[in-house]
């Protein structure tokens, strides 16, 4: 038997970190068992589903490296097929037309709640005779068994049993003729020979209903594994209201690497000893469904930042270059050449946690000129600053060899000649050429800028200082 798992997102919103964790677990399990991973787009909700979200889901899965063996399949392409199956189920007495109005169902619900009962459909139309039909509008409901129970062994949570009397007759086709999620997913899992359904714990209540439909169709029952929720750092349900990044697109724009995200996400509910850093091959080797936690996991931004900086400094140069190219292009920064990007990683990688932070700092290298911050200039520059910058300009003007060693030697000799502290000289130069108070090694920054741009920045700073008033 070939192990087959699936990831079945609905394109009604951005790809969510919790959804990606589910996809990753399903992908890892399939790979660990030499099985297949299926991508299925559940787009029957035509009002909320969009092509833009579909493209975003597919692009982000590809970016993460979660490639699928089959698909993507689209439920919207199979609507007529689902309807034909439902028609046959009605003819076989496995489903029936329900003519109850929304008003009647609402009154029924309120009445049941007033009696302290769990609200569910009372099956009025299940035994309806033709002469009593007063409407042409209807939904189609599945004939759920009256007696017995549904028992399944969840690979994460163990044995789960639900009495059939607790379940109502599920709507499997809406009044507009569109089959419902709970029906389509069953047919797809059957037709695609899905052996293991790995999904969020919010689907546990759907499972007995889906099993009953599968049994009615004499189909094989897959093995289920319901993973726990992902919560915010303050243990709340993920929401835009708590200012938590939740979509993969947002993480990407913020400069997180796919390698660090996967490493971070896999640990939200799974572990292997005390190991923190996992390659994809190690994830596949060690992953089991039984090792997943039952309890919810909380996001940890500090952990993600730590992982991201690790991967920025340890990924192969060709890989990090590709990701930096994307980040620079997104920010409309025209970098000189690809070799520049690798120099930037070496220059800034140990100081910053995300690619976006590297890009933001790098603007000072690529902007035509520095937009000086008046507060920084007035706080850190004084009457000696003009003298320092003039000295540096004159010293570097005729320099023919441009490398870190030569720059360092010339900078040290300038400090000696000025008889001003190295700290003061370096701060003045740093602000003049980058606009920042902090920077990586100053000699490396000067070398990266190049002679012409470095001298131009010094001249611009001198011009700015000329118009400043210092206390005597």
UniProtKB/Swiss-Prot annotation:
One GO-annotated biological process of the protein: glutamyl-tRNA aminoacylation
Motif mapping: 'HIGH' region: 9-19
GO terms assigned for molecular function: ATP binding; glutamate-tRNA ligase activity; tRNA binding; zinc ion binding
Keyword Protein biosynthesis: yes
UniProt KW keywords: Aminoacyl-tRNA synthetase, ATP-binding, Cytoplasm, Ligase, Nucleotide-binding, Protein biosynthesis
Subcellular location: Cytoplasm
Keyword Membrane attributed: no
EC number: 6.1.1.17
Catalytic reaction list: tRNA(Glu) + L-glutamate + ATP = L-glutamyl-tRNA(Glu) + AMP + diphosphate
Entry coiled-coil feature ranges: none
Positions contributing to ATP binding: 240
SUPFAM superfamilies: An anticodon-binding domain of class I aminoacyl-tRNA synthetases, Nucleotidylyl transferase
This protein's GO CC annotations: cytosol
Motif extent ('KMSKS' region): 237-241
Gene3D superfamilies reported for this sequence: 1.10.10.350, HUPs
Sequence similarity: Belongs to the class-I aminoacyl-tRNA synthetase family. Glutamate--tRNA ligase type 1 subfamily.
Subunit composition and interactions: Monomer.
Biological function: Catalyzes the attachment of glutamate to tRNA(Glu) in a two-step reaction: glutamate is first activated by ATP to form Glu-AMP and then transferred to the acceptor end of tRNA(Glu).
Record's protein name: Glutamate--tRNA ligase
Species per Swiss-Prot/TrEMBL record: Buchnera aphidicola subsp. Baizongia pistaciae (strain Bp)
